[in-house]
Amino acid sequence: MRSGRLHIALIAALAIYATLLIGTGTSAAAQEMLLHSFRPYGSPPCCFHARTADGFDPFYSNLTIDTAGNLYGTTTAGGIFGYGTVFKLTHTASGWTEAVIYAFGHNLADGGVPEGGLTLDAAGNLYGTTHGGGANNSGVVFELVNNGDGTWAEKVLYSFNNTDGYGPWAAPIFDAAGNLYGTTESGGAYNYGTAYELTPTGGGNWSEQVLHSFGNGTDGATPFAGLVMDASGNLYGTTWLGGANLCDGAGCGTVFKLSPTGGGNWSEQVIHNFINNGVDGNEPWAGSLIFDSSGNLYGTTTLGGTYLCEGGSVGCGTVYEMTPTAGGNWTEQVIYSFNGGGPGGEDPTSAVLFDAAGNLYGTTYFGGLLEGGTAFKLTLRDGRWTEQVLHPFGASGDGVTPASGLIFDRAGNLYGTTMEGGLYDGGTAYEITP
């Protein structure tokens, strides 16, 4: 991300609900409601809630929903030890209540500073990563076991040691055999990150294998985002930097494919090199790719595209589509470029999400009518994608800087988090109702 833009001026918090509505399309606007305002240490109206505080700063934490409609996520800071939390939001007759179900940093061997979201298994257990902590202070993959009585127990499945990866951001994903796959932003053979596999070996133990070390030539570097898997077991992801083309002295980023080649080995193929050419996006940040029903991939880039931001120096970000072609190749098409001069937002840092009708939903980190970011919907009409702003963040008491993406519940409501803002400037969890 560009330095100097990670924190924007916040409007003083006065109310818990933000209902300012806007739509750039013709359909009815959506309504946003805050479910929880996270509270940093020392927030008003009281003094210091030292080491008993709520978590705060839910960074790139996409929420996860269980079959009962409960929501789960992470905060990078706060909790009784100060190194972040895992939280649960429960819907009751009187509204939503938040509970911290795990606080990191008891001895830092358990991990610290979870940057991303969580993966839920069929038994109701949660899996995630922390950027730091662990036995080697290089981050961990962890499991939170639901004890069934309202309590949770944490187990570190693997502690990275820098040579096999450092600083995982995104939650790992499962394959059908119960193996976990993910990325680390740095470390590995060339210190530009890794893709890894964790395999259960019995007795609650796991072994790790580095599938690929990034940074050797033009294969990409710094994979913040997680992985997705196709029906054949191939993995797909993005790197923030690296690749064949330069942006501001560093690579513009890539989309890559990892394929198993037998004997436990994997090969990497760069299927797209982003380029700063006034059309293509560049620097895909922390949003994982998604598939449509035809096998096409969709993602976002934080920069690039047709319209210029930052005084005309760089693009405002894009949503793009990757389509497989003959011979194992792929073609990329920008389907939407954000215009920082309008209400549509800029700098999307997270993944997009499909609904049943084929519309795409996501967030922008900055921009919008109130300059606090947006939640948006993209609709395909007559071969062209058009944007509707579902909610502009930044009103008094509302959240700002929605770094994470969105999820649906069964009723079609959307849920997400903002990194900042809310009643206590510690970020929010919110619901958007169509």
Predicted regions located by residue number:
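Extracellular beta-propeller repeat domains
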Residues: R2-P434
